[in-house]
């Protein structure tokens, strides 16, 4: 896999032929077929491992004291990873019908960062809506930037990020939730710590608050 990763980074998927990978790894081509099925299986395994390593580094990074600053840094890191690994980005963003385990883990990290923001009362939409918008922005931004020459990319990622932040956050009043959606999202984010309610009551209240947050967003 290390040999395939090196060829991918150097020349993209076209450079990582089965023969080239076998030569670089010092093995026979049948070994690759036995382990990964075919070239596509090998490339998908490389992409999964590369993404998993990146997600693991994100999960282990100490969060910023301010949740919004932390969320902004996470968005920037995602775009930077995508631009630094264009071949991997193309593989992990290809339509497959189901996200890989590493991709799901990445969304879980994003979900935790959004939860921290919601707990401060600065989220003006539901957590689910915020996660979906941020995920779409990150993926779309990377794919759009990869289609542009490096010299024409300035500012696009920041503009896209701030447009989504403006739609999901109220950064001017960190101590007071913004409207009904903000209050519902803030309360829902803290339900796990509300020991006075039974699990069933917390689940019901979570569903009601989710509906309020989404209705207020429309």
Residue positions per predicted region:
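Short hydrophobic clusters on alpha-helical segments that form packing/core surfaces
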Residues: 3-8, 16, 50, 54, ...
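Hydrophobic alpha-helical connector segments
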Residues: 45, 56-90, 94-99, 105-109, ...
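Helix-turn-helix
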Residues: 7, 11-41, 45
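Amphipathic alpha-helical interface segments
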Residues: 3, 7, 81, 137-144
């Amino acid at each position: 896999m290390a040999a395939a990763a090196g060829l991918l980074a150097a020349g993209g998927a076209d450079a990582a032929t089965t023969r080239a990978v076998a030569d670089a790894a010092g093995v026979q081509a049948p070994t690759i077929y036995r382990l990964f099925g075919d070239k596509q299986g090998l490339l998908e395994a490389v992409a999964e491992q590369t993404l998993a390593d990146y997600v693991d580094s994100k999960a282990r990074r100490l969060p910023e004291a301010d949740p919004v600053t932390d969320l902004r840094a996470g968005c920037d890191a995602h775009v930077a990873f995508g631009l630094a690994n264009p071949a991997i980005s193309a593989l992990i963003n290809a339509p497959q019908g189901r996200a890989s385990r590493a991709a799901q883990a990445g969304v879980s990290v994003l979900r935790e960062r959004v939860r921290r923001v919601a707990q401060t009362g600065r989220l003006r939409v539901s957590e689910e809506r915020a996660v979906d918008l941020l995920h779409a922005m990150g993926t779309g931004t990377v794919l759009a930037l990869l289609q542009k020459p490096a010299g024409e990319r300035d500012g696009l990622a920041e503009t896209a990020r701030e447009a989504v932040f403006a739609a999901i956050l109220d950064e001017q009043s960190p101590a007071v939730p913004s409207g009904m959606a903000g209050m519902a999202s803030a309360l829902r984010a803290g339900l796990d710590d509300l020991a006075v309610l039974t699990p069933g009551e917390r689940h019901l209240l979570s569903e009601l608050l989710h509906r309020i947050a989404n209705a207020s967003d429309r």
